[in-house]
A protein has these predicted regions:
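Residue-level signature of mid-helix packing/kink "hotspots" within the transmembrane helices
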Residues: 25, 53-61, 146, 253-257, ...
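Cytoplasmic helix-loop-helix junction between adjacent transmembrane helices
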Residues: 102-140
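Structural signature of the two symmetry-related core transmembrane helices
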Residues: 74-88, 274-289
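Helix-breaking motifs and short loop linkers at transmembrane-helix boundaries and internal kinks
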Residues: 39, 71, 92-97, 271, ...
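Extracytoplasmic gate region of multi-pass secondary transporters
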Residues: 27-28, 208-260
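Helix-loop-helix hairpin linking two adjacent transmembrane segments in secondary transporters
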Residues: 137-184
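Interfacial helix-cap and linker-helix signal at transmembrane-aqueous boundaries
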Residues: 34-35, 66-67, 152-160, 235-236, ...
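Conserved MFS/SLC helix-loop-helix module at the cytosolic interface between two early adjacent transmembrane helices
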Residues: 58-97
Length: 391
């Protein structure tokens, strides 16, 4: 693929990621507004969020299989269109069940985005620069989370009803679907030719290495989700005012935005294994440091923790292409993203139950130690992944 086409593909996928992650995470801002508008109780609020997350987790793997026949670009455009239409319908919702249905379909549409965009980028950057490209794409999603949530907050402060920005987001989704279809080449062109027969099965070149990569993802995802869920509670336990503690997660995410990009660059320059070791050791040390430092010192450390905590994901996604045949990438990415989504559902519950038994500080300490299990797993990858050439 020519460099200009690769760049256009990356830009389009980054824009799509901004829209989809914005649509997915704006629900955090919308939930209290929906509860106030429709008189919802906390159980109903939880059901709304769960419906969206379950749809995203459940449909990622089917999307990977369907894309192998339908084409990654085509299914990505269709899913983006579905999410846009669902958000327009959400803007005209009349009650709880309509909200549930619209956000379920929005989650179904967004489920295709991560595995298919990652596959498309991997096709556009099959060799050098793939991890940097995926790190850039990974960074773009966090931009969407901040922008969409910020737009709703500003509209509410300005006296504009939440329905207006929600419908606007839906229109943005439809426009993005058209852009995807127009600007990304037909990814069915990457299907095997007669000269290169179709790979049977999952197309995994090195099953032990792929399994180890999935295990790294499991440990990394559970640590990340658990830490983000309970860091504010740790700060409150240290005596930090609740208003400051509420800013803990945004601070981690701000650092994480930088980490997602720069860790992809580091992996391209210094190799996958070294980068995983650096980021996971830094993550463990950072988490344990939040226990050792005074309250406000911990607060200001959080962006640095976020760089390492969030950055490993770019390395993981950028490594899948080394282990899987190109025509089987959609299902491979779907597996890894589904693993992360399931961990995001289970980890808060597991760490929450543990915290009730042994306390918040010991629970955070366990998370900081468990993340170091990624180090021996990273060594399993060494034999399968050649160190990328330094530019």
């Amino acid at each position: 693929m020519p460099a200009s086409a690769s760049k256009r593909t990356l830009q389009t996928c980054c824009g799509t990621h901004i829209v989809h992650d914005g649509l997915s995470d704006v629900s955090y801002v919308l939930l209290p507004l929906l509860a106030q508008t429709f008189g919802l109780n906390l159980a109903q609020v939880g059901m709304i969020r769960t419906a969206h997350r379950v749809a995203m987790a459940a449909f990622q793997l089917p999307a990977g299989f369907i894309a192998e026949r339908f084409g990654e670009r085509n299914l990505l455009a269709l899913g983006t269109l579905l999410s846009g239409l669902a958000f327009i319908a959400l803007g005209f919702s009349s009650g709880f069940w309509m909200i549930i249905v619209t956000l379920f379909f929005a989650g179904m549409g967004s489920a295709v985005q991560h595995p298919l965009s990652s596959t498309i980028i991997s096709h556009a950057y099959p060799g050098e620069g793939r991890r940097t490209a995926l790190g850039t794409y990974n960074f773009a999603g966090d931009v969407g989370k901040f922008v969409f949530g910020g737009i709703v907050s500003l509209c509410v402060l300005a006296g504009i009803s939440w329905q207006a920005p929600v419908v606007g987001f839906g229109v943005a989704g439809i426009v993005t679907a058209v852009v995807v279809f127009m600007c990304i080449s037909n990814t069915q062109a990457h299907a095997p030719s007669a000269a290169k027969p179709k790979v049977q099965g999952w197309g995994i070149r090195n099953k032990p290495a792929f399994a180890a990569l999935c295990m790294v993802d499991i440990v990394d995802s559970t640590t990340r989700t658990g830490f983000l869920t309970f860091i504010a509670f740790l700060l409150i336990a240290k005596g930090v005012p609740e208003g400051w503690a509420a800013l803990a997660v945004p601070l981690v995410l701000i650092g994480g935005m930088a980490g997602k990009y720069f860790c992809g660059v580091l992996a391209d320059k210094f190799g996958v294994i070294r980068t995983i070791v650096i980021t996971e050791v830094a993550t463990g040390a950072g988490i344990l440091a939040t226990l050792a430092l005074p309250g406000m010192a911990t607060f200001f450390l959080l962006p640095l923790v976020g760089v390492a905590l969030q950055g490993t994901s770019s390395v993981i996604y950028g490594t899948i292409g080394d282990l899987v045949e190109s025509d089987k990438l959609p299902r491979a990415f779907a597996v890894v993203y589904t693993v992360g989504a399931v961990c995001g559902i289970i980890a808060p519950l597991g760490y929450g139950l543990l915290g009730d038994v042994i306390g918040i500080e010991k629970t955070i300490a366990i998370a900081g130690v468990i993340v170091l299990l990624t180090l021996p797993l990273a060594l399993v990858l060494r034999a399968a992944i050649a160190r990328p050439a330094v530019a």
